[in-house]
A protein has these predicted regions:
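Aliphatic-rich helix starts adjacent to a transmembrane/signal segment
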Residues: 1-37
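Flexible, low-complexity segments enriched in proline/glycine/serine and punctuated by aromatic residues
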Residues: 22-150
Length: 150
């Protein structure tokens, strides 16, 4: 009897440890998503006149752009380069991650950024308020609103 109780206790500890590891991973993914969204928001603020060029839907792959780190670029080229950098960042930091950038439906001149990452449990979900796209299935999402011209 004592051995059965001990076995259940060990199984309970293992389950709690596994849950803690899953939560830790989700918090890490959420922190990375917040950083990516913040980086894109700053890029959009610095290039506010081209804010329409930052619009993006789920699964959209950014076209190639000139390397603006060593070459002077126009604002349009800079926006395309920012999108390309976003794609590279997602691939390296949030594998299977995706992003959407949308105009906020009930607030002129405001934009929204949604960063999604693979999560079978869908720990963090976003609603479709203000024109935000649905978070894809089996993914968690982080949403950020910004006004680029401020």
């Amino acid at each position: 009897v004592a051995l059965v109780v001990l076995a259940f206790g060990v199984l309970g500890l293992l389950w709690m440890h596994q849950q803690a590891l899953l939560q830790q991973r989700q918090q890490l993914m959420r922190s990375v998503a917040i950083g990516i969204a913040d980086d894109l928001a700053e890029r959009m603020r610095l290039n506010a006149p081209q804010r329409a060029m930052y619009a993006k839907t789920w699964g959209h792959v950014s076209p190639s752009a000139p390397d603006c780190t060593h070459t002077a670029c126009t604002r349009q080229e800079l926006a395309a380069w920012d999108q390309q950098q976003l794609q590279l960042t997602l691939q390296s930091q949030l594998p299977e991650g995706d992003t959407a950038v949308f105009a906020v439906s009930d607030a002129p001149n405001w934009l929204g950024i949604v960063i999604a990452w693979r999560d079978a449990n869908e720990t963090y979900r976003t609603d479709t308020a203000s024109g935000s796209p649905n978070c894809p299935t089996q993914m968690s999402c982080w949403r950020l609103f910004l006004r680029p011209d401020r």
